[in-house]
Design a protein with these regions (language model features):
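Alpha-helix capping/helix-boundary segments
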Residues: 8-9, 40, 78, 103, ...
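Acidic, PIN/NYN-like endoribonuclease modules and their adjacent C-terminal/linker elements
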Residues: 1, 104, 108-135
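Histidine- and aromatic-rich ligand-binding microenvironments
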Residues: 5, 37, 95-97, 118-119
Length: 135
């Protein structure tokens, strides 16, 4: 099970990395369960809304979402997990942003791999499996 981070989705949509696009298409073809956090979806929706071409970008986002298994809503248990992660990272002196904490919580709670182009940030989260498909 994979959760895609916002930066990876954008790179796939803009086809900024042949390696990334090939891996994404391969995982889809193999039937790998690929999900988005509702937090990632929010970040993407915000980007579309503020863009110079919202209609075109909304269509592009809708097309991207077609093979995605589901958008996972941030629920009560995710909030509890996020609270634990944020407190732990703050105690260690290595906090990350609140949206990233929420995304990490959803992935870690479900024992999913977070696919990101920012391993340095997500590798701080104990017990979170992290992959970068651009490598």
């Amino acid at each position: 099970m994979y959760f895609l981070d916002t930066n990876i989705v954008i790179k796939i949509m803009l086809r900024q990395s042949e390696t990334l696009v090939a891996r994404f298409e391969d995982e889809i073809e193999r039937g790998s369960p690929i999900f988005l956090s509702s937090i990632v979806f929010y970040e993407l929706a915000y980007g579309v809304s503020k863009s110079a071409h919202p209609k075109r970008n909304f269509d592009r986002l809708s097309e991207f979402l077609t093979p995605i298994a589901d958008i996972i809503a941030f629920d009560r248990d995710d909030a509890l997990e996020a609270g634990d992660i944020r407190a732990e990272l703050e105690r260690q002196g290595f906090p990350i942003g609140p949206y990233d904490v929420q995304i990490a919580a959803q992935a870690r709670r479900r024992k999913a791999v977070i696919v990101t182009n920012n391993r340095r940030k997500f590798n701080r989260v104990p017990g979170l499996m992290v992959a970068d498909w651009t490598e």
